């Protein structure tokens, strides 16, 4: 028998709309997909999020808008609905981003507009026969926009040319755009001094193919424990990713303002779950916040079928990104992305229980009862003695109808997993993969035993698991029809092979903030 560690989440039958995530952003109604245009307003200390939005239905379709939401802390959101719309109902405002044009390089602003709120959107305008890049600017800090009268600003006569990500590159004193020639598997890099006139600098090709590339990003990311940083290129794949359907890959390298050169030939996956796509970072983020971004928590294989009512799709929690050198196996250590979830000041623990030194024979458990929000976090550090081969489980359980979402660790294989096979929502869909998994080396060794860390968040119908301080992550949605969410949560270990060094469970809620 193999020693086995698992988390099980069971649910109480209530109302499907109650499965809406509490902290991860969802639209108040309608359809949502890619995050767009994230930026930080340093004047009002406010995070802005835009998103692909169909307010007229809960499936993708035209006319497609940018929706808009804001947050003081990246956890409590205010939704404003449609913000930028197409000129015709059959067209769409596709993905792009927003920059803060502090120095008015575009010439769109006069002195009455605070430099911290000179907001310019760069996006793909989609018609039946073309994809071109357009610009719009805001005179009120990002709530309404005026379209540039000389659009498009970039047209290469290709119907699969989309998703610009623009940022200011200080060393070369220019704006940089990365954009996908999607079905050529090519990321083009352009430069501009004014956001309206663009020159091609170079092309980046590489990585896992799939069907096409989308939603690229390029940003400088600090390396933990050093004063150094590296550039990271993000590329989304859909369909045909190695995990099935949609996923994100990334590359670590150098950028001189003209060309991105990866350090190695490896394409790294950003997340090992099925529901993490179109990741983008926030422009103008405060230095103390670091590199902050989020992704769409869905997969194009089944996104239009998710069994929610008035709304469809959520974002992930916001994540802080750093780089660190970590072992991929006992012989090789490489620089990799670390992802840590961000909890704003509005997130508080309605209940919290911590326990240490739990073994299977102790038959101890950590329990939180009568949950009112359906939102939990769990933080577990455990060691594994592979010489003891008794089955064991670490469980989070809630009663009544027997459906469950599980997360866990198999010490024999040395791999973590998320299992949503015991949920009935979309159960017959062949693409709603039951199980996803990730391999990581031990976080450390103590008393000659491997030690692992697993932190997780269950937020409505979304689970995000962060392994060994975020060296690997697993993000999955799950659908239990008629569920309110978790009624209570329990952690227990029943195997001599697994020793829980420490554990903490929190029932989370949001409090009002100023």
From Swiss-Prot:
One of its GO terms (molecular function) is fructan beta-fructosidase activity. Substrate binds at residues 33-34, 52, 60, 95, 162-163, 214, 300. InterPro entries: ConA-like_dom_sf, Glyco_hydro_32, Glyco_hydro_32_C, Glyco_hydro_32_N, Glyco_hydro_beta-prop_sf. It is found in: Secreted. Keywords: Carbohydrate metabolism, Glycoprotein, Glycosidase, Hydrolase, Polysaccharide degradation, Secreted, Signal. It comes from the Eukaryota. The active site is at residues 34, 214. Residues 1-18 form the signal peptide. Disulfide bonds: none annotated. Its EC number is 3.2.1.80. Glycans are attached at residues 56, 104, 110, 197, 203, 357, 371, 389, 422. One of its GO terms (biological process) is sucrose catabolic process. Exo-inulinase involved in utilization of the plant storage polymer inulin, consisting of fructooligosaccharides with a degree of polymerization (DP) value from 2 to 60. Splits off terminal fructose units successively from the non-reducing end of the inulin molecule. This is Extracellular exo-inulinase inuE. It comes from Meyerozyma guilliermondii (Yeast). The lineage of its organism: Eukaryota, Fungi, Dikarya, Ascomycota, Saccharomycotina.
């Amino acid at each position: 028998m193999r020693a086995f560690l698992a988390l099980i989440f069971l649910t109480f039958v209530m109302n499907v709309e109650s499965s809406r995530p509490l902290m991860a952003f969802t639209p108040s109604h309608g359809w949502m997909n890619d995050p767009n245009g994230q930026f930080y307003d340093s004047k009002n200390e406010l995070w802005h999020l835009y998103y692909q939005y169909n307010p007229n239905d809960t499936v993708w379709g035209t006319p497609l808008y940018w929706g808009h939401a804001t947050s003081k802390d990246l956890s409590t959101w205010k939704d404003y609905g449609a913000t930028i719309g197409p000129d015709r109902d059959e067209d769409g405002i596709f993905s792009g981003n927003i920059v803060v044009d502090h120095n008015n390089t575009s010439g769109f602003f006069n002195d009455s507009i605070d430099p911290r709120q000179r907001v310019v959107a760069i996006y793909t305008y989609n018609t039946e026969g073309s994809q071109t890049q357009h610009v719009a600017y805001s005179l009120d800090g990002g709530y309404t926009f005026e379209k540039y009268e000389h659009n498009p600003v970039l047209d290469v006569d290709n119907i699969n040319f989309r998703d610009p990500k623009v940022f200011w590159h200080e060393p070369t004193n220019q704006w940089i755009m990365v954009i996908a020639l999607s079905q050529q598997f090519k990321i083009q890099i352009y430069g501009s001094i004014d956001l309206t006139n663009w020159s091609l600098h170079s092309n980046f090709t590489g990585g896992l193919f799939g069907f096409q590339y989308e939603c690229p990003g390029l940003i400088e990311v600090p390396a933990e424990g050093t004063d150094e940083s590296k550039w990271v290129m993000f590329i989304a794949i859909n369909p045909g990713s190695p995990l099935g359907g949609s996923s994100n890959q990334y590359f670590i390298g150098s950028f001189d303002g003209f060309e991105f050169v990866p350090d190695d030939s490896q394409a790294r996956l950003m997340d090992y779950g099925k529901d993490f796509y179109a990741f983008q970072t926030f422009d103008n983020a405060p230095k103390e916040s670091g590199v902050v971004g989020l992704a769409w928590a869905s997969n194009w294989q089944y996104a239009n079928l998710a069994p929610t009512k008035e709304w469809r799709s959520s974002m992930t929690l916001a994540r802080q990104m750093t780089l660190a050198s970590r072992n991929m196996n006992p012989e090789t250590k490489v620089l990799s992305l670390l992802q840590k979830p961000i909890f704003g000041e509005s997130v508080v623990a309605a209940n919290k229980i911590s326990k240490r030194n739990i073994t299977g024979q102790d038959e101890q458990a950590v329990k939180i009862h009568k949950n009112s929000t359906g939102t939990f976090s769990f933080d577990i550090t455990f060691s594994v003695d592979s010489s003891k081969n008794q089955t064991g489980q670490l469980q989070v359980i809630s009663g009544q109808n027997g459906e469950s979402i599980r997360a866990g660790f198999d010490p024999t294989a040395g791999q973590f997993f998320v299992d949503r096979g015991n949920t009935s929502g979309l159960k017959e869909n062949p693409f709603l993969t039951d199980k996803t998994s990730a391999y990581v080396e031990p976080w450390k060794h103590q008393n000659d035993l491997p030690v692992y860390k697993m932190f997780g968040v269950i937020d409505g119908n979304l689970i995000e698991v962060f392994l060994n301080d975020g060296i690997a992550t697993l993000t999955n949605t799950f659908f239990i029809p008629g569920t309110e969410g978790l009624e209570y949560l329990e952690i227990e270990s029943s195997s001599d092979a697994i020793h829980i060094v420490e554990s903490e469970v929190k029932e989370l809620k949001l409090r009002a903030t100023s």
